[in-house]
């Protein structure tokens, strides 16, 4: 049995899970998330806990039981507390603002970048150089943050660019004659 799948996932108050043949749906105060399932994992709900087990003795089923348990745990956390990712803009004239369902970025190009946000994702700009991306789906929040960062990754000589708030950019030394 997978070491991760040994531990059950507890459902907090206000969160409910429904298991069908090929998918699991988790509903909570922040929304509803759906995850497709394979036949390799058995999920049982009892007394506010979800337990996971491999359906057979194959290595693939064992690995999938741990993977599905981790995905469902992230879904439960997402619909109850939510996830957020913070980005920081470093550079002269680099600015960000939220315009409806999009983030407007000024990153030193000749044009402004308008990044549309997918459904269920919200963005805030507490200051002109900070972006906070929030949502219930951990994978989508991380993907949106990575897409925004990819417009202007931090360069290694001055550190200018879009970086995660907890990211450390190693600054290289310039060439010397």
Curated annotation (Swiss-Prot):
Quote the cellular component terms of the Gene Ontology held in the record.
Answer: cytosolic large ribosomal subunit
* Assigned keywords, A-Z: Ribonucleoprotein, Ribosomal protein, RNA-binding, rRNA-binding
Under the heading PROSITE patterns, the entry gives:
RIBOSOMAL_L6_1 (PS00525)
Gene Ontology biological process terms, A to Z: cytoplasmic translation
Pfam families assigned:
Ribosomal_L6 (PF00347)
Q: Which GO terms describe its molecular function?
A: rRNA binding; structural constituent of ribosome
Q: What's this chain's function?
A: This protein binds to the 23S rRNA, and is important in its secondary structure. It is located near the subunit interface in the base of the L7/L12 stalk, and near the tRNA binding site of the peptidyltransferase center.
Record's family?
Belongs to the universal ribosomal protein uL6 family.
Q: How does it assemble?
A: Part of the 50S ribosomal subunit.
Protein name according to UniProt: Large ribosomal subunit protein uL6
What organism does the record attribute this protein to? Bordetella avium (strain 197N)
């Amino acid at each position: 049995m997978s070491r991760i799948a040994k531990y059950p996932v507890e459902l907090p108050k206000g969160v409910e899970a429904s298991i069908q043949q090929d998918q699991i749906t988790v509903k909570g105060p922040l929304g509803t998330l759906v995850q497709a399932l394979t036949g390799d994992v058995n999920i049982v709900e009892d007394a506010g806990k979800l337990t996971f087990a491999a359906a057979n003795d194959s290595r693939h089923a064992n690995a999938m039981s741990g993977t599905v348990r981790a995905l469902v745990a992230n879904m439960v956390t997402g619909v109850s507390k939510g996830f957020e990712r913070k980005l920081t803009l470093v550079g002269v004239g680099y600015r960000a603002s939220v315009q409806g369902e999009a983030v407007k970025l000024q990153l030193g190009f000749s044009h402004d970048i308008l990044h549309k946000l997918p459904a269920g994702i919200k963005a805030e700009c507490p200051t002109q150089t900070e972006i906070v991306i929030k949502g219930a789906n951990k994978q989508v929040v991380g993907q949106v943050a990575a897409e925004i960062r990819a417009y202007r990754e931090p360069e290694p000589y001055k550190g200018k660019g879009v970086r995660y708030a907890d990211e450390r950019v190693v600054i290289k030394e310039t060439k010397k004659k």
